[in-house]
Amino acid sequence: MFTSINPATGEEGARFEALDDDGIEAALARAEAAFRSWRVSEIAQRTALLTGIADAFEANKQHLAETATKEMGKTLASAVAEVEKCIAGFRHYAAKGPGYLEPVETKAASGRVVGHWLPLGPVLAVMPWNFPYWQAVRW
């Protein structure tokens, strides 16, 4: 069991069940299954989803910031700034992402090389959580 504790007050917040080995394997399997369908989705679907997430963050900015403040001890101003950075990030990738995924052609000694961006699949990362929302956006 994990319990969120407000570092400023010591007050207990939400509680979360820890995953056992089977729970971890099930979560990884769900991530892999989601990847298989996501990797063949249309770019328009992806950009619409990113825009929708940005809109949801915008609509819930104060709540998200207050949650980060309670769970991490961040100042409210810092938490709001992080949420706003995430909104900008989602909107940036919705607008510019399709261009980033275009094939890249380069001259080579033997002619030309065309690079294609291919999905990697689920990424498991151990990262510091001083910017919890941004961690999800930047990956």
Predicted region positions:
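Conserved small-residue-rich beta-alpha loop and adjacent elements
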Residues: 104-139
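N-terminal Rossmann-like NAD(P)+-binding subdomain of aldehyde/semialdehyde dehydrogenases
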Residues: 1-111
